[in-house]
């Protein structure tokens, strides 16, 4: 219990430092979600089982960082592409109750876990769907999010048909990204469906846990 309290205090401190406004209720829900994520992870492989840092910080707080580069607006529609255990969709749904989130994953067990956690948290602005992104038809989103390790070129190909005009693809990624960014931009010069610009925001200054981590913002012309 003491460790959980310490992690909760650290979450509050990080949010304050980054200018992320968080209510007591949201804080409690984020802490509860981290607990559920760890519990479900013993049954379904949602996150690494060899964590060297608190799940509440490494995964849950990390999932809030797109708010540093994107203003989530009331009524906005957001797709979480390859959500896994609900990351980043569930933490952001907690923070932005007036934004609608659709979480998709091709692994049924992960979606079962996400749906159960969404229900237990009482989130009415998020739902989880077992499907492949290629099978999403007739839907359009203001913003698409992903924590997947897939190259930006591949994620862009999935995202483009599902983005509304002036939409953004926001990815939480790590490592040396220049090669995959260059590949995506080259495709953008040759054909539609790829971003016209890509911006990077390093987040290592937020915490050493996120050294070599960056937020990738891909925009379509």
UniProtKB/Swiss-Prot annotation:
Top-rank taxon, per record: Bacteria
Role according to the record: Specifically methylates the N7 position of a guanine in 16S rRNA.
GO CC entries: cytosol
Gene label: rsmG
Binding, S-adenosyl-L-methionine: 82, 87, 105-107, 133-134, 147
InterPro entries recorded: rRNA_ssu_MeTfrase_G, SAM-dependent_MTases_sf
UniProt KW keywords: Cytoplasm, Methyltransferase, rRNA processing, S-adenosyl-L-methionine, Transferase
Localisation: Cytoplasm
Organism of origin: Chlorobium phaeovibrioides (strain DSM 265 / 1930)
Record flagged with keyword NAD: no
Family label: Belongs to the methyltransferase superfamily. RNA methyltransferase RsmG family.
Enzyme Commission identifier(s): 2.1.1.-
Name of the featured protein: Ribosomal RNA small subunit methyltransferase G
One Gene Ontology molecular-function label: rRNA (guanine-N7-)-methyltransferase activity
């Amino acid at each position: 219990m003491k460790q959980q309290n310490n992690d909760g205090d650290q979450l509050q401190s990080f949010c304050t430092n980054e200018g992320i406004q968080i209510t007591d209720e949201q804080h409690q829900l984020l802490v509860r979600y981290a607990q559920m994520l760890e519990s479900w992870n013993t049954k379904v492989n949602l996150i690494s089982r060899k964590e060297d840092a608190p799940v509440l910080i490494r995964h849950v707080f990390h999932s809030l960082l797109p708010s540093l580069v994107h203003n989530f607006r009331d009524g906005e529609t957001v797709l979480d592409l390859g959500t896994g255990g609900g990351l980043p969709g569930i933490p952001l749904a907690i923070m932005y109750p007036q934004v609608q989130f659709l979480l998709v994953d091709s692994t049924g067990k992960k979606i079962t876990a996400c749906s159960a956690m969404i229900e237990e948290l009482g989130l009415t602005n998020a739902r989880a769907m077992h499907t492949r992104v290629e099978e999403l038809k007739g839907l359009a989103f203001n913003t698409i999010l992903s924590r997947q390790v897939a190259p930006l070129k591949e994620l862009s190909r999935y995202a483009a048909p599902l983005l509304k005009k002036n939409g953004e693809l926001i990815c939480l990624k790590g490592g040396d990204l220049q090669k995959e960014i260059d590949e995506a931009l080259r495709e953008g010069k040759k054909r539609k469906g790829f971003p016209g610009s890509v911006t990077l925001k390093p987040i290592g200054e937020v915490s050493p846990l996120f050294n070599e981590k960056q937020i990738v913002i891909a925009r379509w012309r």
